[in-house]
Design a protein with these regions (language model features):
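Domain-scale activation on soluble regions of proteins
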Residues: 1-376
């Protein structure tokens, strides 16, 4: 009998001195084996399936809960959106790699299309000798065109805002400014939001598998990325002007949805089903990894009294580097901890950060089966 998921999914584990992230017990029933890819097209599609399933499981969890939780609806939206969106990107690249076999050509394809779903779709259509029926492709083009207006580079649901450079004029210098992802409060219909992702992925999956039967889910939804409204307990309310604690909903979302996947895998394994371990492990790892990055950026951006322009510049300079962000905040953390018993604890945190960075220094390890240079 399947256990009910815990209502509270906050972490109760504390860092321990000397503990290693990659330590495992060979007789444990919870061991997950991650195999090196042999063919990148197949590996990309496998990753797409993993991220799709993770998104689907988490969405089911919050939409069909016995006691709906508004807090989860308003925050888990961000990690759900990323997981669904990422499986589309992986699926499209898997289709492209079915035709693009040369390593240098694959590298060029990835570099030129980056993460923009509309651009990737267009490039794949140009290269493929087979596509889906005309009506399906037209729906997909419209949907990805609208989606890309909100999330062109796959970062709008991983971070609370964009930092952009605003050029100056003859009277003043240029400066960094915050560009909010959502400029105003938006009540998103999460059911429609998820159904559209699933409709798009149905087309992509059939395209990759070269199936001849028509997709049908797209017929039930409009090719518009976000629709507002819906029943109160299926709404995700997002979007406020920039303020302190802007990172909190994202950090909460990535931490707690990772914890949910961990709970789900453990519960399934305890029930004799180990299949979910392999399928949900990588999405779980990425959710945790992004939570660490978000937590460090929260400290840097919201807790440290540094000049705003310096904060923006150094955050951009360090991109996704956990080691880089830790290096920036460490002097401030040590300064604030003087006269307390925290310095030793800070050393433990630093060790954990360095371990995570060593495993995944650029936030790609758990998202893709290869690097941008096509190294597997």
């Amino acid at each position: 009998m399947e256990m009910e998921a815990p209502h509270i999914l906050i972490s109760t584990v504390s860092p321990e001195k000397g503990k290693k992230i990659d330590t495992f017990y060979k007789h444990s029933k919870y061991i997950v084996k991650v195999l090196a890819p042999t063919e990148l097209s197949e590996a990309l599609f496998q990753y797409a399936e993993y991220f799709f399933e993770a998104a689907h499981k988490i969405t089911e969890f919050i939409l069909y809960a016995e006691h709906p939780d508004i807090g989860k609806l308003d925050t888990y939206f961000f990690s759900i959106a990323f997981l669904y969106r990422h499986c589309m990107e992986l699926g499209l690249k898997a289709i492209g790699f079915q035709t693009i076999q040369d390593r240098d050509e694959r590298k060029k394809f990835v570099k030129e299309t980056r993460h923009n779903l509309a651009v990737i779709l267009s490039a794949v259509e140009e290269k493929m000798s087979w596509t889906r029926p005309k009506e399906e492709m037209e729906w997909l083009r419209k949907y990805f065109a609208d989606l890309s207006q909100k999330d062109r580079e796959s970062d709008s649901f991983r971070y609370p805002f964009h930092i952009v450079w605003e050029p100056g004029d003859w009277e003043c210098e240029g400066r960094f400014v915050i560009k909010n992802i959502f400029d105003e409060q938006t009540n998103i219909d999460l059911v429609k939001f998820a159904n559209k992702f699933e409709a798009a992925y149905e087309i992509i999956r059939k395209w990759y598998k070269k199936e001849t039967e028509s997709a049908f889910e797209w017929k039930e939804v409009d090719p518009v990325f976000i629709e507002t409204g819906g029943y109160y307990y299926v709404q995700s309310v997002v979007g406020y002007k920039y303020r302190r604690a802007d990172f909190y909903p994202y950090t909460k979302a990535y931490l707690e949805t990772a914890n949910y996947l961990k709970w789900y895998m453990k519960n399934a394994t305890d029930s004799g089903n180990c299949d979910y371990n392999a399928r949900l492990f990588l999405p779980m790892c990425y959710l945790y990894r992004n939570c660490v990055e978000l937590s460090l950026k929260t400290i840097w951006f919201e807790e440290i009294g540094e000049d705003f322009q310096i904060k923006c510049k150094l955050m951009l300079d360090n991109k996704h580097s956990i080691a880089g962000m830790w290096k920036q905040i460490k002097p401030y953390v040590l300064e604030y901890s003087r006269g307390t018993d925290e310095p030793e604890y800070i050393e433990v945190i630093e060790d954990y950060c360095m371990q995570v960075h060593k495993i995944d220094g650029d936030a790609n390890k758990f998202r893709y089966p290869m690097s941008n240079s096509m190294q597997e």
